[in-house]
Amino acid sequence: MPDLTGRTALVTGTAHGIGAAIVAALEAHGATAHGVDKDTVDVTDPGQVAGLIERIGAIDILVNNAGGVCGQVGQAVEDVSDEDWLEVVDANLTSTFVCTRAVVPAMKRAGRGRIVNISSGAGRSVSLTGIQAYASAKAGQIGFTRQTAHELGRFGITVNCIAPGFVLSNPTTIRQWESYGEEGQRDLVERIATRRLGTPEDIANGVLFFAANESSWVTGQVLSIDGGQAIF
């Protein structure tokens, strides 16, 4: 596993689940990891993000994990308000842009950097109905990953993306799982090659791979960590 001693990491969306597991994994491998959530820093606000970077200093590893459906599930497209749309797009995509823009200058000066964006299987293919903004923002995050990887590779900065499958990582995913009932839960697990749901640690292990020195020739990639669900 990678040795990240001396590296400084910033992880967004760390109140629980995947974000918290990523912080723990980075620290376990030697990095100094700073986790933030919406209660401490609004990562869609350039001023707040700039202030955070000023306090922390140069960032070697950025993990853009902030996001979520913001309670918007099962809405017909005609019922999605402008405010609803922007809330989800800002939380998932704008935050990725704002944080990436903030850390890149120091990464360029250092001649090295690792950026990992946490997208979703919903950004790669059709998912639940009624999550139009979330799926669109996550697809946009994948596009942003590829564009910035192409732009920043010459500076020693890699940009990659992880698309998690079904992970019981927060109250929203737990409620979603419970809403399926026993039959629906069995059907979902049967569509996963490994026949189990994911854990936050599964996603954190993918981040460790992309953050490692050994992954310096891997950039612009989207890694599905979904137990093989995407192959069905």
Residue ranges and their predicted role:
Residues T100-R101, R146:
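A short, exposed helix-loop element centered on a Lys and neighboring polar residues
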Residues V73-V77, S81-V89, W177, L188:
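Substrate-binding pocket helix/loop in short-chain dehydrogenase/reductase
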Residues D39-G51, D82, E201-D202:
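The beta1-alpha1 cofactor-binding region of Rossmann-like NAD(H)/NADP(H)-dependent oxidoreductases
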Residues G153, T158, A163, V218-G220:
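Short, small/polar-rich loop/turn modules that mediate ligand/substrate recognition or access, typified
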